[in-house]
Structures are given as C-alpha cells and as structure tokens.
A protein has these predicted regions:
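Acidic, Ser/Thr
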Residues: 24-25, 259
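Structural signature of tandem-repeat unit edges
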Residues: 2-17, 27-50, 60-73, 86-99, ...
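A short acidic (Asp/Glu
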Residues: 277-282, 304-307
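Universal eukaryotic N-terminal targeting presequences
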Residues: 1-3, 325-326
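C-terminal capping region of solenoid repeat domains
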Residues: 304-326
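Consensus positions within tandem repeat domains that build extended binding/scaffold surfaces
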Residues: 19-21, 52-54, 73-80, 99-107, ...
C-alpha cells in the first residue's frame, strides 16, 4: 500500500479481517518516512477489524487523525499504538469502542504523547487494560473521566511509569476487577481517589503503588485482598494511610508491603486479621517515622517485630503506639 495515497483516499470500505494486525505495524526506516503522519479524514468504514496492532512499532509516526474511521465492529485494540515513540498528537476521541474487550498495551511506550481525551469512549465491555498507558512518560493530561469499565478484570501496569501525570479522575465501577498488580508503579501521582470503586473480588494489589514517590493522599474502597507484596513499597511521601476497609484474611505474603514509606506516621489497619502463617518480612522496613498503628491486639503481636525499634512499641485499646523517648 502507498501510504501517501492512503492519506488522501476517498470514501472507502475496508475489510481487514483477522490479519489487521499487519496493517501498518513495524514500519521502519525508509518506509516509516512515508508514515510520519496519518490524516485520512474521509469516511473510512472498517467492516471487519478484529485484531488491531495496526500502528505498533511505527516509531516515526508523529501525528494521526483517525476521527473518521468507523470502528464500531472492533473488539480488540490491543497494542494498536504501542511503541509509537514519536507520536505527539492523536485524534481518536470519537471512536466507537462499544464492542471493544481488550485495551491492553494500547498506548504502551507512547513516550512523546502529552495529551489524550478519551472521555467519550464507551468501555463497558472492556475486560483487560494491562499496560494500557504504561510508559507514557510525557503524558500530562488524560481525560477518561466518563469511563465506566464495569466488565474490567485486569489492569496490570495500566498506568505504570506515567511520570508526568499528577492527578487522574477515576470514578469507575469495577465489580469484576481481580488484578491491579503494578497498576500505578513508578508513576508520579500526588493524589489518587479510588474510594467509589466497587471491589467484590479478591484483588491482587502486589506492587500496585510501588515507587510512587510523590503520592501524598490515597483514598481506597472496601476491598477483599489476596496479594499485598510491596504494595506501597517506596511511597515515601505518604504521611497517613487508612486501610481499615480492607479484608486481608486470605493474604499470605505481606513482604515489604510498606517498605520505604519513610514519611508514614499513622497507619489504620484496625480491621486486618493477619494469618499466623503469613509472611511479613520487611513489612515496615524504613518506616522510621511510624508512631501510631490502629490494629487489633492479635495483629499487633503478629507484626510488632517488623516495626522499627520494635521493643519500643506498646498496644492498648486497639492502638499500637511507639513509646516517647525520654
């Protein structure tokens, strides 16, 4: 296909079938120079486009205006723009995504992209968002405020390495969600409010907020948790954390859960029932400012050895407190 001709093509109906992942992917070197922009603004009705890796690895693509594409039949957008490292502007805000089930790796490593408005997308059938925005290191504005991913099951590393995003509105219904491992890892969010999320299933929170060094405020929903390894490891700006609405009855590994939370002073885990066989190694390593932990007596005696200066702690009336230095 001549891509210059494609950019100026009249109204066309395309049936790309199940081989659509070959559409533009991996265009490099001299060929890619023909695809530094893609601006087909004429009516392009795609009657069958089920597996869309279309622009994956188009490393020279800088601008794409695909607003006129008819995407109503698409079920899979995985890796569509992944590794488009030069992409700075993308116009797909009006795409019909009502049948899409897979958004994994959609914008993964779009490291030049600065703004995305996807608020009009219907994501009600989406089941996986693994790595969706991972590696979008320059992304400063992301509007997904109207999303309601009510079928979502997994969002592993969804926002990992989003180093330029400071805030994000996520008023979601997530009653089927099971996996949030590394979801916000290595990002620079200052505030995250997940309080309205519904989490009816046991969630994998391992490494979820790993190395979120700027995270100061976190609101979490009622949750049944199954994995907590290194969940808050490296959250060095958190001062207070309320996790009293988490059920951890089935968690077996708490290793390094709060490691490196060097500003954390108050922790509320009063509802936690930690299994006597659970691994808690390194749970509070580096939490040198921790003074108060709201917890049951049973929990206190299971984790007190992991507290900094553990011999200086006492428990009374559902509160573990570090003794004042004389």
């Amino acid at each position: 296909m001549n891509f210059i001709q494609f950019n100026h093509a009249p109204c066309i109906i395309y049936d790309f079938g199940n081989n659509s992942f070959l559409l533009f992917s991996n265009l490099r070197c001299s060929i890619t120079s023909e695809l530094d922009t893609c601006t087909n603004n004429r009516s392009l009705k795609i009657v069958k486009l089920n597996n869309v890796n279309s622009f994956e690895n188009c490393v020279s693509l800088k601008y794409a205006d695909l607003r006129r594409w008819n995407t109503e039949n698409i079920t899979d957008l995985s890796s569509c723009f992944s590794f488009c490292q030069s992409l700075k502007k993308l116009r797909i805000e009006n795409w019909n995504t009502s049948n899409v089930e897979d958004l994994s790796h959609l914008f993964s490593t779009c490291s030049s992209l600065r703004s995305l408005n996807l608020s009009r997308w219907n994501v009600s059938k989406v089941q996986t968002m693994d790595y969706c925005f991972s590696g979008c290191t320059e992304l400063r504005r992301l509007n997904i405020s109207n999303w309601n991913p009510c079928s979502l099951i997994s969002m592993r590393q969804c926002f990992s390495k989003c180093k330029s995003l400071r805030e994000l509105t996520l008023n979601w219904t997530t009653s089927h969600l099971r996996n949030m491992s590394n979801c916000f890892a290595y990002s620079n969010f200052e505030t995250l409010n997940l309080q309205n999320w519904r989490m009816n299933n046991a969630i994998d929170f391992s490494y979820c907020f790993f190395e979120c060094k700027n995270l100061q405020t976190l609101f979490t929903p009622d949750s049944h948790v199954r994995k907590l390894e290194s969940c808050f490891n490296g959250c060095e700006s958190l001062i207070a954390l309320n996790l009293s609405n988490w059920n951890v009855d089935h968690v077996h590994k708490f290793n390094n859960c709060f490691k490196g939370c060097k500003s954390l002073a108050i922790l509320d885990i009063r509802s936690w029932n930690i299994n006597s066989r659970a691994h808690t190694n390194g749970m509070f390593n580096g939490c040198d400012k921790l003074d108060i932990v709201f917890c049951t007596e049973d929990t206190f005696y299971k984790i007190v050895e992991q507290f900094p200066n553990s011999d200086e702690w006492v428990w009374e009336n559902n509160e573990a407190r570090k003794l004042d230095e004389e």
